[in-house]
Structure formats: structure tokens, C-alpha cells
A protein has these predicted regions:
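Non-cytosolic membrane-interface motifs at loop->transmembrane helix junctions
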Residues: 33-41, 70-71, 96-106
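Membrane-water interface at the C-terminal end of transmembrane alpha helices
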Residues: 109-123
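Membrane-helix boundary elements
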Residues: 3-6, 14-41
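Membrane-helix boundary connector in multi-pass membrane proteins
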Residues: 63, 85-102, 120-121
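Interfacial segments of alpha-helical transmembrane regions
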Residues: 1-12, 69-72
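Membrane-embedded alpha-helical segments of multi-pass transporters/permeases
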Residues: 22, 59, 88, 112-116
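Core segments of alpha-helical transmembrane spans in multipass integral membrane proteins
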Residues: 15-22, 39-62, 75-82
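Hydrophobic alpha-helical membrane segments
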Residues: 72-87, 107-110
Length: 123
């Protein structure tokens, strides 16, 4: 496995989440034990488009980053660690739960570690 593959895996996962938020917001929020109000679905749709943009960015970074490739991998390691912390906090405080929240927690932890390890190898 190399850093390019980690970016591509993260991009596919982000695209799935982005499309889910955009087109199946009520289902996504229900899986996280949240009540899907019309306002929450609207915010979810906006977030879905944002996550789709991040997926596109993650897919393209290996091709366009040049000398900054390893540094961007380290930056994404920090980003995934931050997502891990906020989802963990939401689980601990009871604001999110269920398989979706725990699944995201695991995925974010794995991606944070992979981004960090592979970016160090690429230096």
C-alpha cells in the first residue's frame, strides 16, 4: 500500500458518504440515531456536496500535489484524527450512536493512521 492508494480509498469512502448525505439524508441521520428534521436534511445536503468536493480533492491530490504530496498526507492524517475526536465526543455525549457512528469512528482511525504512516514513507 502506498500514499496514493490511501488517498484513493479515502476518496471513495468520502464519495459514498457525500452521496448518502445528499440523496439519503434521512436514512443517514437515522443510522446515527438522529431525528431527521427538514432543517437537518438541508444541512446534510450542503454537507454532502462539501464531502463530495473533498472526495474529488482526495482523488486528485496524488496526481497534482508534486513535492507537497507527503505533506498533504500528513495534513489529511490530522484531519481524520480531528474527525475521529469529534465523532468520539458525539458518541460519548449521546448525540450520535448506532452502527454508523461507530463505523465512522473505526474508518477515521484507520485512515488517520494510514495517512500518517504512508506519508512518512513517502518523505
Amino acid at each position: 500500500m502506498d500514499l496514493k492508494l490511501v488517498f484513493r480509498i479515502a476518496a471513495v469512502i468520502a464519495a459514498i458518504n457525500g452521496l448518502g448525505l445528499l440523496f439519503m439524508g434521512a436514512t443517514f441521520f437515522a443510522m446515527a440515531n438522529m431525528t431527521a428534521t427538514p432543517n437537518l436534511i438541508t444541512v446534510g445536503q450542503f454537507t454532502g456536496v462539501t464531502v463530495l468536493f473533498l472526495a474529488l480533492l482526495q482523488w486528485r491530490i496524488p496526481d497534482i500535489a508534486g513535492d507537497a504530496f507527503s505533506s498533504l498526507g500528513q495534513l489529511f492524517a490530522i484531519g481524520y484524527a480531528m474527525w475521529f475526536l469529534i465523532v468520539g465526543y458525539h458518541i460519548m455525549t449521546g448525540q450520535a450512536g448506532g452502527a454508523a457512528a461507530y463505523g465512522n469512528l473505526v474508518v477515521e482511525a484507520v485512515l488517520a493512521v494510514l495517512f500518517y504512516m504512508q506519508s512518512k514513507k513517502s518523505e
